[in-house]
Amino acid sequence: MSPLANHSFVKMNGIGNEIVVLDLRDVKHVVTPDEARAVASRVPYDQMMVLQRPRFDGTEAFIRIYNNDGSESGACGNGMRCVVSQVFGKTGQTSATFETRAGLLNCWQGPAPDLYTVDMGVPRFGWQDIPLAEEFRDTRYIELQIGPIDAPILHSPSVVSMGNPHAVFWVDNDVNSYDLERFGPLLENHPIFPERANITLAQIVDRDHITMRTWERGAGLTRACGSAACATAVAAARLKRANRLVHMTLPGGELTIEWRERDDHVLMTGTATFEFEGRFEPALFASVA
């Protein structure tokens, strides 16, 4: 029987990003792709944040991040805020450090009781870091488009790694006027992205405000993607089209992103909302090897 049978979980959302938080620090088990997909079939989520025993002194947990297709991700900003909310709520802490595949993340209570800040680390721009399948010296724009050659619908995205690959397409019109459900999977799986990519449409309202919509790698169309908001804010600042502190509007809500000048770390501040707590029924994993 799966060690997840009868185990408790918490369902949350980070401004619309559907999150399951699963604390396995008391269980020596690594969730399998089949188990992750089984959970998603009963408790729909965009990402599942699994807390495992920390590997280093001074950290709260090692976080494994699963997409609903069973694949793993290196980063999920909205999910991290949900984890932080749960941990702080139980321990009374106001700051903590967590381990992820993308590195150590420092987190703390935000400027209001329902706000949490996650230091998402330093963005990477090298074509091999993102990664891309071929060399681009300047990743502020790369050659990629959807639509006719002489009149592309989307073209020339900025690419950034926030521990996971992001492509940001700049648009002049409302981000909701584009058929992202159609273009998203094509771009996510484009050969230029050997590890696939998160695809974002972004409209710069002014230097302090950006609206965006994201097709999330391994999860599909989402109401919010925190790492995509970070990547978009950084990409806009690299192009000198936005300030380093920006207000981001996503379908599910609002985030504040700061690309801190003194050390190039990206700070994301937003809410985390509790929905319900439950336990996994053993039958859910009956067909899982």
Curated annotation (Swiss-Prot):
Q: Which InterPro entries match?
A: DAP_epimerase_AS, DAP_epimerase_DapF
Example GO CC term: the record gives: cytosol
Asked if the record carries the keyword Electron transport, the reply is: no
GO molecular function ontology, one term from the record: diaminopimelate epimerase activity
Pathway listed: Amino-acid biosynthesis; L-lysine biosynthesis via DAP pathway; DL-2,6-diaminopimelate from LL-2,6-diaminopimelate: step 1/1
Q: What class of enzyme is it?
A: isomerase
What does UniProt list as catalytic?
C76, C225
UniProt EC number: 5.1.1.7
List keywords of the entry alphabetically.
Amino-acid biosynthesis, Cytoplasm, Isomerase, Lysine biosynthesis
- Matches recorded under NCBIfam families: DapF
Subunit structure, interactors included: Homodimer.
HAMAP family annotated for this entry? DAP_epimerase
Record's family?
Answer: Belongs to the diaminopimelate epimerase family.
Q: What is this protein called?
A: Diaminopimelate epimerase
Q: Which organism is it from?
A: Bradyrhizobium sp. (strain ORS 278)
Which gene is this protein's source? dapF
